[in-house]
Amino acid sequence: LNKELLDICYKKHNKEIDLTWEQLAQQYGFSSGECLRSWFKRIRRENGEIGYKNKTRILHISDNHYPFNLPKEVFKNYVGKVDVLVFGGDEQDCQSVSRFKKKYRVPFVDEMIGTRQMIIDIIEYIKPKQVKLIAGNHNYRLINYFSEKVHEDLLNLMPETNLDFIIDLGFWKHDHQSKSKTFYEPLTKVFDGKIDIEYMKNWWCKIGNTIFAHPKAFKSGILATTEKAYTYFLQLGEKFDTLCLSHTHHQGFSRYGKVYMYESGCLCEEPSYASEGTMIRPQDKGFVYLVQDEQGNLIYDESKLICL
């Protein structure tokens, strides 16, 4: 840190000298006066002298795996303090169309009804301004199941994930015994005019300079899956300063170069069907709270990985 330059900047800030920022920038090797002012402003922020304007507060939650989900009260410290709520995939377990034992399964439509209500309850509890949802590997279980049972021509009648039904399309539950049916409105209509809710129809999305992702790939080892995702997004040419990953059910944090990397953990009890003698590493419960400045850059000191 150039103490002489910092002293000069404070004098300029306090109007004790007549030099312009542009003149100071040329004198001390900065590309422009604006670049020097940004440097000085960053130093003052780091010293706690000034705050940030127009901050964006993001709560990233994932892997609820309804009906094994944790109660919404785990978010009690963030009620009314969130601008963007990101559901990072696997809100529903979709166990009835999985490969696991049938004795643990519940009807798929009932599970989807419960997942829909869980999402509504969380949104109404936290009260965010916007909601974004990305798809996890369990969200694709429905189309994977049908692709094995149904002719490929008929698959064109089906959306790819359960979130298409819950968020955008709505769905019916038919009771063939009583010959009745109930329609469950899509959440875009439930929250119409109240909260901006969007299903991204992809396994990742970008908000500011942060990438949120739920890959299908898994690599054992601490933050190994996140490091693989980091390389993948660099190869895509994406520019980002933060990577927040779902899927692994584990938590971790690291900084690689100038990029902050988080694994968010999960928000569910471990399904009993998935742990019968597999000797898998115990899962980590938690979520991630991120704060960005007006340019979408991470404010690290105000962001955190929450462990439950």
What are the roles of these predicted feature ranges?
Residues 38-51:
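Short, solvent-exposed alpha-helical "recognition" segments
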Residues 61, 66-178:
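Core catalytic region of metal-dependent phosphoesterases/phosphodiesterases
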Residues 60-62, 84-90, 132-137, 212-215, ...:
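Active-site neighborhood of phospho(di)ester-bond hydrolases with catalytic His/Asp-centered motifs
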Residues 1-19:
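Short, amphipathic alpha-helical "recognition" segments used to contact nucleic acids or chromatin
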Residues 149-227, 266:
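Active-site-proximal loop/helix segment associated with metal-binding centers of metalloenzymes
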Residues 51-59, 204-211, 256-259:
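Beta-strand-turn-beta hairpins that frame and shape the catalytic cleft
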Residues 216-306:
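Conserved beta-sheet core of the metallophosphoesterase superfamily
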